[in-house]
């Protein structure tokens, strides 16, 4: 295993010669794409939809290697960042009432919109005596819940990558009945479609190509992104997470733009198949059903969330068990990503996470960034998770700046 990992690192991470060659190819294709071909003179905007891709791009300073007319933009790629604050308020309330709340470590400090004088996160609730337990996986929560009979709830946060474990544990009847499931699962393709449409409807600088997430694609399959070139004429590449993977994806996208032949390519062939994992997909479909879902800072997106099907929901759905009324599309307060005003319970005042998540703004455009909002004391959701764009920029943005200055 170690030798295999070393081979991958040498080929896709430490291969400076290949990286230099790819940069030259990128410069070649970018240089051929002129404003007459695009219809405008602004940069060629390529969007990715994965927090790990943003980490790779920023950590390794890949933006500093690109021509000035190529811009990499982070889209909705952080599942923790898009959990609406009303679910955080609900979790805080349950923990303080004695219910055991199981959560991933990334979500422990996820802030609600309450004043700092009140419990704004599960970490605050834990300090006040709330029953909050950090787990690494749903399996850990299942195992711990079996050791007691108390009411418990697991915050089921995540994109498609977490669904295999969620689905199989329910399918195999491994989940104890005292453990309820608060489904905060969000699906990437609907969010991708929503974001691209939003850019076009608002007349924003258009997205010219997409780097599709590799981890998600191992589950759902590369073919799920076919709608991007077919319906939106967007060159799309499913990419891995090493620097070479990303550079290869950029080069392929620019070539497709230059050739005027938008298509779907799978660069991450060492793990991604066109149909993903059919067995896993069948289990997921048997356990969950798609629903309208709220995305923090964005709004409601059709069929972008999952809830337990009735045969599982009767015993495990946290909304039903605790008598919680979920937010409906008509009730959800839209945020500044749409109308210029923060929602009453979604995004904290002055925070621009809604725009950052959609790639409309950069973290450095936010007046709170690295001032009243830092990784140590996050004010907005994008600063909390290691996959959040603001968190990544806060930790590694200076590295990229140094690389650009010494280029």
Report residues per predicted region.
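Short, acidic/small-residue loops that bind anionic groups at enzyme active sites
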Residues: 72-74, 128-139, 175-192, 207-211, ...
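Active-site histidine-anchored catalytic micro-motif
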Residues: 148-156, 161-213
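Internal helical hairpin/lid segments
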Residues: 248-355
């Amino acid at each position: 295993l170690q030798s295999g990992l070393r081979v991958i690192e040498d080929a896709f991470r430490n291969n400076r010669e290949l990286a230099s060659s790819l940069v030259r190819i990128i410069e070649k294709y970018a240089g051929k794409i002129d404003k007459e071909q695009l219809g405008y003179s602004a940069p060629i905007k390529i969007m990715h939809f994965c927090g790990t891709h943003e980490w790779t791009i920023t950590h390794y300073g890949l933006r500093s290697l690109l021509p000035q007319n190529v811009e990499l933009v982070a889209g909705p790629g952080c599942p923790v960042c898009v959990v609406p604050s009303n679910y955080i308020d609900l979790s805080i309330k349950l923990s303080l009432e004695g219910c055991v709340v199981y959560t991933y470590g990334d979500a422990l400090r996820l802030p609600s919109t309450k004043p700092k004088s009140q419990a704004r996160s599960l970490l605050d609730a834990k300090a006040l005596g709330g029953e909050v337990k950090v787990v690494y996986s749903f399996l850990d929560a299942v195992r711990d819940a079996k050791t007691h009979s108390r009411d418990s709830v697991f915050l089921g946060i995540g994109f498609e990558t977490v669904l295999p474990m969620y689905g199989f544990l329910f399918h195999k009847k491994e989940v104890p009945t005292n453990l309820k499931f608060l489904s905060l699962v969000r699906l990437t393709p609907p969010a991708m479609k929503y974001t691209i449409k939003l850019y076009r409807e608002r007349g924003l600088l258009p997205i010219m190509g997409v780097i599709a997430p590799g981890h998600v694609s191992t589950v759902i399959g590369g073919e799920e992104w076919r709608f991007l070139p077919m319906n939106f004429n967007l060159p799309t590449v499913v990419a891995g997470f090493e620097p070479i993977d990303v550079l290869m994806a950029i080069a392929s996208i620019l070539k497709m733009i230059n050739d005027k032949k938008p298509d779907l390519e799978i660069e991450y062939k060492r793990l991604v198949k066109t149909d993903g994992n059919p067995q896993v997909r069948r289990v997921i479909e048997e356990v969950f059903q798609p629903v309208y879902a709220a995305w923090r800072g964005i709004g409601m997106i059709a069929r972008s969330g999952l809830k337990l099907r009735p045969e599982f929901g009767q015993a495990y759905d946290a909304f039903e068990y605790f008598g919680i009324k979920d937010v409906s599309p008509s009730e959800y307060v839209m945020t500044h990503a749409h109308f210029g005003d923060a929602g009453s319970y979604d995004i904290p005042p002055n925070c621009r996470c809604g725009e950052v998540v959609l790639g409309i703004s950069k973290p450095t455009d936010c007046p709170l960034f690295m001032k009243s909002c830092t990784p140590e004391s996050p004010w907005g959701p994008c600063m909390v998770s290691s996959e959040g764009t603001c968190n990544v920029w806060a930790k590694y943005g200076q590295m990229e700046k140094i690389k650009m200055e010494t280029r």
